[in-house]
Amino acid sequence: MELHQWCRHIIVFLLNVWIPSCFAQTTPPARSSPTPTPQTADNPDSLKFRLSGFPRKHNEGRIEVFYKGEWGTICDDDFSLANAHVLCRQLGFVSATGWTHSAKYGKGAGKIWLDNVQCSGSERSVSVCKSRGWGNSDCTHDEDAGVICKDERLPGFVDSNVIEVQVDENRVEEVRLRPVFTTATKRMPVTEGVVEVKNKDGWAQICDIGWTPKNTHVVCGMMGFPHEKKVNKNFYKLYAERQKNFFLVHSVACLGTEVHLAACPLEFNYGNATESCPGGMPAVVSCVPGPLYTQSPTMKKKLKMPPTTRLKGGAKYGEGRVEVLKGSEWGTVCDDRWNLVSASVVCREMGFGSAKEALTGASMGKGLGPIHMNEVQCTGNERSLWSCRYKNITAEDCKHTEDASVRCNVPYMGYEKTVRILGGRTRYEGRVEVLHREADGTLRWGLICGEGWGTQEAMVLCRQLGLGYANHGLQVRLSGGRSPYEGRVEVRVGQRWGSVCSEGWSTKEAMVLCRQLGLGFSMHAITETWYWDSSNVTDMVMSGVKCTGDEMSISQCQHHRTVNCQKAAARFAAGVICSETASDLVLNAPLVQQTTYIEDRPLHMLYCAAEEDCLSKSAASANWPYGHRRLLRFSSQIHNIGRADFRPKAGRHSWVWHACHGHYHSMDIFTHYDLMSANGTKVAEGHKASFCLEDTDCDEGVSKRYKCANFGEQGITVGCWDLYRHDIDCQWIDITDVKPGNYILQVVINPNYEVSESDFTNNAMKCNCKYDGHRIWVHNCHIGDAFSEEAEKKFEKYPGQLNNQIS
């Protein structure tokens, strides 16, 4: 009995313990909405961290954590600068300057150790920050986070784990081709040579034992070349036997889809590097340049082939917003899952090398029209982006704020060494100087005559300098500017620098110059540079410069064989101001088609228009105030989809007051309205004398900045548009004298290139018109570069529909 009673007490005790514990258990949080909690590793000090990925510097990269014997990544969900601060300190840096998402440094492999990490920034270790917990994640490696640390080490930091995991990748951050032939050293670009990698002791070679075409493919891509070819190793073998080589890398095993040699499996030499390639020699590659960089007739023919992919809105060759052709219509690519592998397919398809950057968020400006592709996933072996896996777009998937862009590796041409700008306030502006070779072979710098120097010339020069928008042997520089982006243009002739005559110097020339110097776009083409402090350059060595705006270098533009400058004084030397960003104006074509109509307007209502000279010449002989004029009216809505505000070239002091309109006009010629015959002959034109520029309305979240009223600032803000309604004065073409027939309505924005833009090819809009003397049919309105060349040729043949009647 006592035993039975004792057992009963035991059972009651166990039930009292077990039942409350069951009811105390809670349901775990749903996967889609985690509740981060602090997750502490067994020993936070035992965690190891490293920076990986490519291309990158030593203080940035994909963050990886070594936990429970395995390296893994961190998901970018809820990632912040505070997280980056904690991680950078654990890596031995004083703090973070930024962080990256969407696997900017490439996708990692293996585990994703942490997700939804939320640090305050003061934690000693990321392991004590809130998160889902170790190994608990709903991410893919497309979402790997990266950090950018301040390049300053913590005093006394001695964690060898961090240093050791960075050593190998740091050694191959720079790669070059060293040409061996004497003639090859003078020819640009260098397409063949010994592969060398840079380390702390200088440049070293790679042993070619086991070297494969896939390795060559990766190296050529880094050098800016889309393809490779076999190389004659016999010559190089003889050369190598006479040289003392230093072999840093013993073995390379690329897959061929990598964008950087650092991403390939590498074996390094740690012994006697001069004798560590028995039976081998330095690796040698031979690359095939794209059509833009070759003299080969076969490759040049490829330039004339209709493209299916193009880059728009970039300041330099090899960068821009990705656009693809589908059903004769150009459209953009959504940036979902956009990465370096897919970007490299685009770059090689365009005739460049592998991708340096896969940019998201409309980094090169927003596109127009349809978005053709979403979630593009390439393997890296495709010849065209259309060969990659992708999803068709739906209205809910993407907007043009998510347009994908690329920056490609391009061949080094040395153009930026042949031009300079001096005297400007920044490196983006200055007087233009060029380096020129005289008849005796000597080199000297000189000025460029500023007569006719305009925005187009300046855009060419800014691209040459690498400063953005605005022949190899002609050296150019900017002199005297307030910054590296401005200055007087100077060229070198023999051993002497000289200036450029500013007669004819315009936006197109400045575009090329800024591009050549790598300074972006041209903001202004300057024709008088007396206010910029001069270098010792006094000679004018170049005049008559005329560019199309597409050249890589100012030497590829037309110019006088001998200097012929009417204004040869130094004050008239050409100059530029370059900028990293530019505006991009485009007309709302559907709105033109929807609002076009004919009005017979009585002359007594057109006195103000006559004062503005908005009627055709025959109006002067009309029987005023009796009779009427027949007007083709329409609305024009001009959007700025670029990356900088569109501002009038003229300062406020030169704006003109228009009493009829009650405000100032800041631009004499802002748009051209033309009615043309099918063969392009102009039969009537708009006579709008001048324009004011303002923000009529803007995209959601964008504030208006410019207004025509009073004497305020004028312009068009990025993300805003200027609307000229069909019912305002002079918003028409006077077609009183036009006979019935088939015509083309054309509207061109910024026709004289007075203001720099990132893309001038989308400034023209065309419509088909059929006029029977009483009614007009307007159809097929589109931006000039919206369709393929083949579709554009069929432009006049499309049938129209009745659009309106005379009002």
Swiss-Prot record:
GO terms for cellular component: collagen-containing extracellular matrix; cytoplasm; extracellular space; membrane; nucleus. Pfam families: Lysyl_oxidase, SRCR. Contains 1 lysine tyrosylquinone. One of its GO terms (biological process) is lung development. There is a cross-link at residues 688-724 (Lysine tyrosylquinone (Lys-Tyr)). It is an enzyme of class 1 (oxidoreductase). Disulfide bonds join 75-139, 88-149, 119-129, 207-277, 220-287, 254-264, 334-398, 347-408, 378-388, 514-578, 547-557. It comes from the Eukaryota. Its cofactor is Cu cation; lysine tyrosylquinone residue. Residues 1-24 form the signal peptide. Its EC number is 1.4.3.-, 1.4.3.13. Keywords: Copper, Cytoplasm, Disulfide bond, Glycoprotein, LTQ, Metal-binding, Nucleus, Oxidoreductase, Repeat, Secreted, Signal, TPQ. It is found in: Secreted, Extracellular space; Cytoplasm; Nucleus. The keyword Phosphoprotein does not apply. Residues 49-150, 175-288, 309-409, 419-470, 476-579 form the SRCR domain. Glycans are attached at residues 272, 392, 536, 679. Belongs to the lysyl oxidase family. This is Lysyl oxidase homolog 3B. It comes from Danio rerio (Zebrafish).
